[in-house]
Each structure stands twice: as C-alpha cells, then as structure tokens.
Regions:
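Conserved catalytic core of two-metal-ion nucleotidyltransferases
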Residues: 2-58, 77-168
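Short, His- and charge-rich active-site/binding loops that engage polyanionic ligands
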Residues: 67-72
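A short secondary-structure junction signal
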Residues: 60-65
Length: 169
C-alpha cells in the first residue's frame, strides 16, 4: 500500500466487527466540526470496502453446517468485542458456555490464555475458506450477509462480467 494508506480488518483493528477488509487514507474517521465544514460534510477519510465472496457447497447439509458454524463464531466474536449479548452483559460463565459450543461444533480447541478474539477471527476466516473449497453449487455469496439470510447468493456468472459506471457526471 502507499505510505499514507492502511489496511483495516477484524484481525488488525480491535473495533472492526465486519467481515471485510478496508483500505483507508487514515486510521480513524475525523468528524471534527472545522474539518467537516471545510470538506462539505465529508469526513476527511476515504476508503474502499472489500467484501470477500465465497462459493456455496453443492450439498445443502454441508452448506447449513457451515452457516451454523459461521453464525455461532461471529456471534461469540461480537459478544467478546462488545462484552454483551442481546443488549445485556454476558457473564463469564455464559461466555465460557458459548466458547465451548464453538469448540464442540467446529471440532477445535480454543486456548483460554491467548486472545480469544484473534483465535475466533482466525477460525471464522478458516471456516469460510473451507466452505469455499467444497464442491461448488455454482452459487456465490457474501458470507457476512449470507450467514443471516440463506437466500443471499447469486449464480457465479453474475460476477464474471464488468459494467462500467462513470464516477460523477
């Protein structure tokens, strides 16, 4: 990346909870009154969001298994980040229960003496990668949206053509 650009994702930045990568010209959004006025309300940060796409497995049973795992890992990851679940604080026992569920469902061991957030983020990425390696149904999805809505997928052909869209005027 150029010198004054940063790549931000949930591995590198603690408060990023979206399953995406972000290339930005600043590490933080600047929303001070003077700068907003100077730049016509535009925070002096610009960037590009990069959403990864994965193919869905041909076997519906395998597809549902990955969706359940990805959903559970993501929920626990968010709970760790915000230290709350369903608008209420999670106790250590509740968190431990959910981490044990992830371990059981995914067949992994999570070290309690290391960063839970980093381990879960890695596991989340690994599960989406593994899902994409299954025999493909020919359908592609944005995993972040698909995890909540199983109907969010499109034929692979949709992503194989480019459409030029002019930028401003």
């Amino acid at each position: 990346l150029p010198e004054d650009c940063w790549f931000i994702d949930f591995h590198r930045t603690k408060d990023v909870n979206l399953m995406l990568g972000r290339v930005m010209n600043s590490k933080f959004h600047v929303v001070e009154g003077e700068l907003l006025e100077k730049y016509h309300g535009f925070p002096y940060v610009a960037g590009i969001d990069i959403f990864w796409l994965d193919s869905l497995p041909e076997d519906d049973r395998i597809c549902r298994k990955y969706q359940e795992q990805i959903n559970l890992i993501y929920r626990v990851l968010l709970a760790l980040q915000y230290e709350e679940c369903a608008s209420k604080k999670m106790t250590r026992d509740e968190m431990e229960y959910h981490i044990c569920q992830v371990e059981k469902m995914c067949g992994v061991s999570i070290r309690r003496n290391a960063s839970l957030r980093e381990q879960l983020a890695d596991l989340l990425e690994k599960r989406t990668w593994e899902m994409g390696r299954q025999k493909s149904s020919g359908e592609i999805t944005n995993v972040y949206l698909w995890r909540k809505n199983a109907y969010y997928h499109l034929p692979q052909e949709v992503y194989q053509t480019e459409t030029y869209i002019p930028f401003e005027n």
